A protein has these predicted regions:
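Amphipathic alpha-helical repeat scaffolds
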Residues: 2-5, 17-21, 29-37, 49-50
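Long, charge-patterned amphipathic interaction tracts in eukaryotic proteins
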Residues: 4, 54-154
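Repeat-mediated protein-protein interaction surfaces in helical alpha-solenoids
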Residues: 7-17, 28, 279-281
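Long, compositionally biased intrinsically disordered terminal regions
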Residues: 10, 89-92, 104-107, 112-117, ...
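Alpha-helix N-cap/N′ positions at the starts of helices
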Residues: 12, 24-27, 293-294
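Solenoid-repeat scaffolds in large eukaryotic assemblies
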Residues: 32, 41-45, 311
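Extended intrinsically disordered or low-complexity segments
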Residues: 136-140, 147-169, 174-178
Length: 352
């Protein structure tokens, strides 16, 4: 580890290794990441050239020039590829190992998990020593912000592969070293990025179907806003005659806050307007969040169209923030989605 160092164009080569992830054996990619952290840029260029040629991938003109400058022979076999030819690897990810599926019975395993807000017994059941070493390493990884773990599934005949996704608030040139540090600690694949980076689809998919193992911000409860005052098993949802109403400037300010939430689950489905059924199925149902509360566009519709106030606790929260919506980071978005899909096996802790 003492030999790790930053290099010129380290951020660009790190990005290239992110782009080829999933198109090469993990051991081959791990060797290339180690080479980059050790400053062996020529070896990295050769590895990327070999991977892209074998997979039929086409680097951009800028990437081609970067490879050629580092190692001219690395681009020898890339002349037959078409610009922009870069399909997504045929892989799937899930937050727990396939062998752990029985822990969630009779439910199906959830699409993602937040293990920072569940009982220790559940965490212990879905993690192992490698995960624990990764979490312990966070105190030694510069700028560590969050750590996810996913299991990658490709061919059903293959053994599931562990993939860590690490968010570290460091300059791009330092990401190869950060990734290599955690890779050395765990022996597993590590996809490192800095918050705000635009990630390739492979890493986005891995993080979006992962278990959040650790975050530098303590876990907190996620509020899930109610829409209606009640639901009749026969006639459906309803609002009470005395449901609070918002008017004037506050109605508009609350509406803008709700509309400005980060989309987390989008749908084109519409439901009927229960206040004016003659309007038909016009009520939107997508989910949004500010990182602390999650609500549906249904809430905003009834506010904008009929003046009906949101869930009292959500409204108090919006007022407490003086109607200024915060930026929702990747960890907050993950925690929100995990609260929506929280399995019974994980218990009720951490949700309002």
């Amino acid at each position: 580890m003492a030999d790790f160092r930053t290099v010129t164009y380290g951020a660009e080569f790190h990005r290239l290794l992110q782009r080829v992830a999933g198109h090469a054996p993990d051991a081959e990619l791990a060797a290339a990441r180690l080479a980059l952290a050790e400053g062996r840029v020529g070896d990295v260029a050769r590895a990327v050239g070999t991977i892209t040629a074998a997979a039929g991938l086409a680097p951009t003109d800028e990437e081609f020039a970067l490879l050629a400058a580092a190692e001219p022979e690395s681009v020898t076999d890339l002349s037959d590829t078409r610009p922009g030819q870069w399909p997504m690897p045929a892989v799937d990810f899930q937050p727990t190992a396939p062998a752990d599926a029985g822990l969630f019975a009779p439910e199906a395993p959830p699409p993602l998990l937040d293990l920072t807000a569940v009982p220790y017994e559940f965490v212990a059941a879905v993690t192992d020593e490698t995960d624990q070493r990764a979490v312990e390493a966070m105190s030694r990884v510069p700028g560590a912000r969050a750590l996810w773990r996913a299991w990658r599934l490709s061919d059903p005949r293959d053994t599931p592969a562990r993939v860590f996704v690490l968010a570290a608030d460091v300059p791009g040139a330092d990401l190869p070293v950060v990734a290599a540090l955690l890779q050395a600690e765990t022996g597993a694949a590590v996809e490192a990025y800095a918050p705000g980076d635009e990630l390739p689809a492979y890493q986005v998919q891995a993080r979006g179907a992962a278990a959040l193992l650790w975050a530098d911000e303590e876990a907190y409860g996620i509020g899930i806003a109610r829409v209606f005052d009640g639901v009749d098993p026969v006639t459906g949802p309803w609002f009470a005659p005395g449901h609070p109403v918002l008017d004037g400037a506050e109605r508009d300010r609350v509406g803008r806050y709700l509309e400005g939430g980060r989309p987390v689950l989008m749908t084109t489905q519409r439901m009927a307007d229960v206040v004016e059924p003659a309007r038909g199925a016009v009520v939107p149902m997508s989910y949004r969040t500010d990182g602390v509360w999650v609500w549906t566009d249904t809430v905003t519709y009834y506010l904008r169209t009929h003046g009906l106030a949101p869930d009292p606790e959500l409204l108090a929260h919006v007022r407490g923030r003086e109607f200024r919506a915060p930026v929702v980071d990747d960890v907050a978005e993950h925690r929100t989605l995990a609260a929506l899909f929280r399995p019974a096996a994980a218990g009720p802790v951490g949700v309002r």
